[in-house]
Amino acid sequence: MKEWRKNLFGREWLFQHGKVAKQSAGSIWARFGDSVVLATVNVSDNVVEGIDFVPLTVEFMEKFYAAGKIPGGFVKREGKPSESGILSSRLIDRPIRPLFPKNLRNEVQVIVTVLSVDPNCPTDVLGITAASLALNISRVPFDGIVAGVQIGYVDGQFIVFPTAEQLERSKIDIVVAGTKDAITMVEGEAKEVTEEEMLQALMTAHEAIKQIVAFQEEVIKEFNVEKMPLPEPKYNVELVEKFVEYIDMTELEKRIFARGKQERAEMADEYYESIVQKFFEDNNIPEEEQEEYAIPLKEKYDEISKKLMRKIIIERGLRADGRGPKDIRPITCEVGLLPRTHGSSLFTRGETQSLGIVTLGSPAEEQIIDTLIEEGTKRFILHYNFPPFSTGEVKPLRGPSRREIGHGHLAERAVKAIIPPEDEFPYVIRVVSEILESNGSSSMATVCSASLALMDAGVPTKKHVAGVAMGLILEEGKGVILTDIIGLEDHWGDMDFKVAGTKDGITAFQMDCKVSGVSEELLRQALYQAKEARMFILDKLYETISEPRKELSPYAPRISWFFIDPTRSGELIGPGGKTIKSIIKMFDVEISLDDSTGKVTVSGVDAEKVQEAVEYIQNMFRDISIGDLYTGKVTRVENYGIFVEIMPGKIGLVHSSKLGNVKPTSFKVGDKIKVEVINIDDAGRLQFRRLEE
């Protein structure tokens, strides 16, 4: 067993190898503070045929014992990955995936297992570093050393790996990954910070990354691992290179620079098929061998197309859909499309379209959070759906994909900044984004549609939030930043850079970079160009709806809340919940009680019944005085009068002489009657007189 220790950022780091998981191709036991993860790497001996991508899977396995907890539910064991586990898997996958050889076709599986959790030392960020180290000491071809850090910003100071308490007060919460040469991934949120503050956070992160990479280098130099050979191509490589001669650049340019996404794809495929057939005929490639050339020829065609697109952007500043580098696609916005929903919007930017829907619910509908670290509830939820018809494809409909969960999480972090506090707006808010069309930047379209729909629903947001996806083309030191990228520019570009925020600052940030050498100045330019675009998009949102609607939808529940003495919470609940259940049934409402603060929340579809329930409960805790007026319920009828309950357990007599001209027998149990308190004797017994309707 080998062991390496170092103190970094005020906490001890430990890497171990050779003690556990020795049958894996690569394994690292990593400890940071009291957080411990095991990163393992394994690779298949067989090549996967017929694919044009690296078959990599990354799994983040959360174990509840790591936090000293037993899983909830009937089955007391871990099941399929949780949403937080999926997000952590993506966080590890994104910085390591670009470092595999493009022609690796053996299945690679990276598993990061969480064994111990320290709330002040994030296991997902530790997982990035542990996975990098496990890959580098394995036989899997892997070109680079990456590390991850978390950055906070408290009281004007940037903090590397802030504590949980510091994160509560932090204006920035981002995870940054990279090599010693460059930042390659960013994911996080902020509380309306400036572009300069975000840039300095990135620079602080990179300096910290260099230290962790240097520690990894100390470990890796002690291993002399022979990397597995990459598969030899079965086709004639020289013949594939010759295929380039069949591509007419003028014809190719016409097809790449077609205006519409589908038109562009159809024209490009049509041209490709025509030259491939000629290539096969001219080079006498028999039909049974043509299948072997299908993927390499298409890759070569895409490579030439990519180079041409990039060259024209660099030299002419012209993009595939005819825009300049800073141009934003045409934007249209609508609100109030769906009559029965609580709020709705349609945001369209070019060929990307998001239908945003808001649903308001009672506090009882809060989402329960039970992760390794976090326990509690969540009152703002955003879900992102990406159906296959949005790209004109046919695919089976299953549960949400990892991509959908990741995009929804980013949009939720962006919009969360404008959600009013619970004491101002006690509703549970669910936003759903249905992507109806997609050609790049659908997560940022989701941010925009969500902001519009929230105002349409009457949620008292103080401002709009918008997002934009930026790109980068970097050739021989010359870089062009692209605003509002389409799918092709995302696929063939060097960077996908998403920024969301209000007019006052950035609220969410995500970046994936495929190249090194992105300078601080280029990042600054990208941030400020994104700000310019964001302001333009925000103006479009404000033109559509400038402030929240004054009234909620008639179909939204009505909510009222107030406080009672928390020491008397038991009186509202009653024995076995009898009292609160009877009130719920009586008024057809939902009631939630926080017995620690005494906060009572009443919700229901009928506003009048909600108000009646509120008054009923408030009366329960109000001292009864002579002259008070109540609406009560008849509980007993006698010859000498009727007994009326004005609140649970508070029953008094209306003597026949106090009923006016009505006899007691005119009433029946359950009738409602308005009464006035006319006497309270020494024993606390109540006497009422009937009030005329």
Curated annotation (Swiss-Prot):
SUPFAM superfamilies: Eukaryotic type KH-domain (KH-domain type I), Nucleic acid-binding proteins, Polynucleotide phosphorylase/guanosine pentaphosphate synthase (PNPase/GPSI), domain 3, Ribonuclease PH domain 2-like, Ribosomal protein S5 domain 2-like. Residues 557-617 form the KH domain. It is an enzyme of class 2 (transferase). CDD domains: KH-I_PNPase (cd02393), RNase_PH_PNPase_1 (cd11363), RNase_PH_PNPase_2 (cd11364). Its EC number is 2.7.7.8. It is found in: Cytoplasm. It comes from the Bacteria. One of its GO terms (cellular component) is cytosol. Keywords: Cytoplasm, Magnesium, Metal-binding, Nucleotidyltransferase, RNA-binding, Transferase. Mg(2+) binds at D490, D496. Its cofactor is Mg(2+). One of its GO terms (biological process) is RNA processing. Its main location: cytoplasm. Belongs to the polyribonucleotide nucleotidyltransferase family. HAMAP family: PNPase. This is Polyribonucleotide nucleotidyltransferase.
